[in-house]
Design a protein with these regions (language model features):
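Alpha-helical transmembrane segments of multi-pass small-molecule/ion transporters
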Residues: 1-321
Length: 321
């Protein structure tokens, strides 16, 4: 019965939002780059700030960061070996490696987490007690994901040499980083936001973030047009959607002090399809084609894999029971 709840409350709403983006892209001239800028520079930082501000995290919760870094490193090694066997073209190998290893939960991660922890089987009797902390934990991974995409992802995919100073500059010019730092500062100095005009505005950013990111992803899918699936696309997608969650399960044995909710978030983080922001890594046209085809393949396959991973979260780590 749980798997039916997961499909009905978690997967189908995402498909509806993606379909809305698909429909709007066919009826109106929508500039995807503008929406990406709004998301990454405005909506996402405010969402991360508000999510982290609402729930003070324990020291053990920050174990998510080294766990996610280890997972990314393992995926990078695995995808590097895989890419060498799939293509002899350096730029295509870089693209394959980037799509299989670089995390980017900033688009669908928030939507999936919100839907998962606000409905059955993770919430009951109209109460979603775990939702605020789940969004806070995901915001940690969103911040890390965005930083990795702008630094490590850029270094992997870009054919230009990247110095340490240039990568550091890219990290320091990441807006979501400052959203997280401001949230921790507001908590540390006990700055109250409730009762001010800012609180309802920040609260509404959660809903805006969910709708805008899902619809924008639908627009991106519409712009990808038709595509063919080949082994250089399918195998990296399977690494991201199937091997990555299995690696995450194995890594959790190294972090026994992590609570069940954090383990669930890490497992979701590992299973979410990559929705790489092309504009942030400056890809060539050949690489962009690989990215678009990989995005479509991962999104299509994730309709089958995500319900299974969410069910495993419930089975192995029953934080909300």
């Amino acid at each position: 019965m749980d798997i039916l709840y997961i499909i009905w409350f978690d997967v189908l709403p995402i498909l509806v939002f993606l379909g809305g983006g698909w429909f709007l892209a066919g009826k109106f001239k929508i500039e995807v780059k503008t929406y990406e800028i709004v998301i990454t520079r405005v909506v996402l930082p405010f969402f991360v700030f508000f999510s982290l501000y609402q729930v003070p995290l324990a020291a053990s919760d920050f174990l998510l960061l080294p766990a996610a870094l280890l997972l990314t490193a393992l995926l990078f090694v695995l995808s590097s070996l895989l890419s060498k066997g799939l293509s002899q073209e350096p730029s295509l190998r870089q693209a394959i490696c980037g799509m299989a290893s670089c995390p980017n939960v900033c688009y669908l991660g928030g939507v999936l987490t919100y839907l998962t922890f606000s409905h059955l089987p993770f919430a009951s009797a109209g109460e979603a007690a775990e939702l605020p902390k789940a969004l806070a934990l995901l915001s940690l991974l969103m911040t890390l994901s965005h930083l990795l995409l702008r630094t490590v992802g850029h270094a992997i995919v870009s054919r230009e040499s990247s110095s340490l100073s240039s990568l550091l500059l890219r990290a320091l010019t990441t807006p979501v980083l400052y959203g997280a730092l401001l949230a921790f500062a507001a908590q540390h100095f006990d700055i109250p936001l409730k009762g001010t005009f800012l609180y309802p505005v920040l609260h509404h950013f959660t809903g805006a973030f969910m709708v805008l990111t899902a619809v924008t992803t639908g627009v991106m899918i519409r712009r990808s047009h038709c595509f063919t699936v080949s082994k250089d696309i399918l195998l990296p997608a399977l690494v991201k959607l199937l091997v990555s969650p299995l690696l995450a399960l194995g890594l959790l044995a190294i972090f026994p002090s992590m609570d069940d909710l954090a383990k669930e978030i890490l497992l979701l983080f590992a299973a979410i399809p990559c929705a790489m922001d092309f504009s942030m890594v400056g890809t060539t046209s050949a690489q962009k084609s690989i990215f678009q085809r990989s995005l479509m393949t991962q999104m299509s396959l994730s309709i089958l894999t995500l319900p299974l991973v969410i069910f495993l979260c419930r089975l192995f780590f029953p934080a909300s029971m």
